[in-house]
Amino acid sequence: SLYPASALVLTVGHGADAATAEVQRAVTLSCRPTPTGTHPAPAQACAELHSVGGALGLLRTGAEPGRMCTKEWRPITVTAEGVWDGRRVSYEHTFANNCFKNAAPTTVFEF
């Protein structure tokens, strides 16, 4: 292959961490050579991942300015497992609730 592999399985689940979260949805995302997968917006998600060099921890997970969410604790955990530019990656992030997840300015976990 001309390109190192960049393929991920992304999940969204109810729970405080990946080990205990009940997975609600899962999609695939492959970014090389062209964006594909079951993710609803693969081109946009791959562009965001390319912008941070595949370092999922650098994606902005805070709410966009002006977005209001309640402080209720109903944790939503997102995960990414797979390979980016030929390197194995494993990522998880927990949002306080679904509003905070949806308020984050990233499409990677919008599915």
From Swiss-Prot:
Keyword Transcription regulation among record annotations: no
Single GO term (MF): serine-type endopeptidase inhibitor activity
Main location: secreted
Keywords: Disulfide bond, Protease inhibitor, Secreted, Serine protease inhibitor
InterPro entries: Prot_inh_I16_SSI, Prot_inh_SSI_I16_CS, Subtilisin_inhibitor, Subtilisin_inhibitor-like_sf
Domain of life assignment: Bacteria
Pfam families per UniProt: SSI
Site feature location: Reactive bond: K71, E72
GO cellular component terms given for this protein: extracellular region
PROSITE patterns with a match to the protein in the record: SSI
Disulfide bond positions: C31-C46, C69-C99
Compartment(s) of residence: Secreted
Binding partners and assembly: Homodimer.
Family: Belongs to the protease inhibitor I16 (SSI) family.
UniProt-listed HAMAP family: SSI
Function: Strong inhibitory activity toward subtilisin BPN' and, to a lesser extent, toward trypsin.
Protein name (database record): Subtilisin inhibitor-like protein 12
Organism for this UniProt entry: Streptomyces hygroscopicus
